[in-house]
Amino acid sequence: MLNDHDRIFTNIYGMHDRSLKGAMARGHWDGTAAILGNGRDWIIEQVKASGLRGRGGAGFPTGLKWSFMPKQSDGRPSFLVINADESEPGTCKDREIMRHDPHTLIEGALIAGFAMGARAAYIYIRGEYVREKEALQAAIDECYEAGLIGKNACRSDYDFDVYLHHGAGAYICGEETALLESLEGKKGMPRMKPPFPAGSGLYGCPTTVNNVESIAVVPTILRRGGAWFAGIGRPNNTGVKLFAMSGHVNTPCVVEEAMSISMKELIEKHGGGVRGGWKNLKAVIPGGASCPVIPAHLCEDAIMDYDGMREKQSSFGTACLIVMDQQTDIIKAIARLSKFFKHESCGQCTPCREGTSWMWRVMERLVTGEAEVEEIDMLFSVTKQVEGHTICALGDAAAWPIQGLIRHYREEIEDRIKARKTGRMGAMAAE
């Protein structure tokens, strides 16, 4: 359990004043000018020492990512882009930061931008996040009026602007290069890499793309020291993290907890337990819709961090759990996710464009039991042909949930096919 004095987000539930005055009263924007005065190299070294990894799902070391930006300008401006396009089913943590604690993000953007020599930050917010956009824009306006950003930000002789861009609802724009394309006014389709954004990103200029939570935790890390953050959790999985729980828990929520907390403790302590008790648990998707499902017997000792989820043949992702009880039709649940990825594919890569549609059609047949048993292996084979063969990771995201389903629930799939053939499906439906 995380100690209260180690918490970074002081208003995640919106119980306090989210204005600049309220944020300052809770300790935000405290000594920001002094932090900037320590210089770019000090900031990046502290972030590296903290062990902070990207909170958007990939888990790339944040300090290392910042260090890829050019130290000296070649005449092109540098930019920080904040990915607030939180569009994956089950993921709902960043919206709480933007809606209730927006000043953590803006202060973090200023410090991160300074560390990378960026001229401005662009916050790309999900199209459906209307109230979040209003709260964030109001906070940005407050900071401009107070002189915290803009010309001579925080009286540091550093000019830094923050722009808020409202997306149009495309999931694919959550991929960093598709996001950059969208910001430039083009169709949101991922770019080939290299060149990477740090070399040629927004408008062909050096750019770093970070998740909302990754940026929002930076000011507190620098105030308390990288060693403090590194002392929470376990090696390679350090710090505090926002976890979300939805589905069949008694109290769905977003909560700030220490990394490496056990899944069972997280669900029992903060989610109010599984609906009907822990024995009624069927499966958990641990980090948003793109992560392979984990069956109940593996959830008993599952550790919620990058390494812990890898050991369970899944992924930590965004740490937003989707909990499913024994009454869940797991095949139908994964088929619904398959439909989402099919719908959101941009169509640029053939394996993803054709593969997601094909996988969804087979999944629909598995739901009704109309498929043949041989199609299970064929479906798994197709997921492997899609995985790793696309420009971006949407192909992987579409393949992994299906792989997890077949890996752990093959017997249930086969039983449904046999039930259809023997007429048991009609009897089951009647019950």
Swiss-Prot record:
Entry-linked InterPro entries: ComplexI_51kDa_subunit, NADH-UbQ_OxRdtase_51kDa_CS, NADH-UbQ_OxRdtase_suF, Nuo51_FMN-bd, Nuo51_FMN-bd_sf, Nuop51_4Fe4S-bd, Nuop51_4Fe4S-bd_sf, SLBB_dom
Disulphide bonds in the chain: none
Cofactor: FMN; [4Fe-4S] cluster
Gene Ontology molecular functions: 4 iron, 4 sulfur cluster binding; FMN binding; metal ion binding; NAD binding; NADH dehydrogenase (ubiquinone) activity; quinone binding
EC code(s) of this entry: 7.1.1.-
Binding site for NAD(+): 54-63
Organism superkingdom: Bacteria
Keywords: 4Fe-4S, Flavoprotein, FMN, Iron, Iron-sulfur, Metal-binding, NAD, Quinone, Translocase, Ubiquinone
Alphabetical list of NCBIfam families matching this protein: nuoF_fam, PRK13596.1
UniProt-recorded name of the protein: NADH-quinone oxidoreductase subunit F
Organism expressing this protein natively: Rhodobacter capsulatus (Rhodopseudomonas capsulata)
Taxonomic lineage of the native organism: Bacteria, Pseudomonadati, Pseudomonadota, Alphaproteobacteria, Rhodobacterales
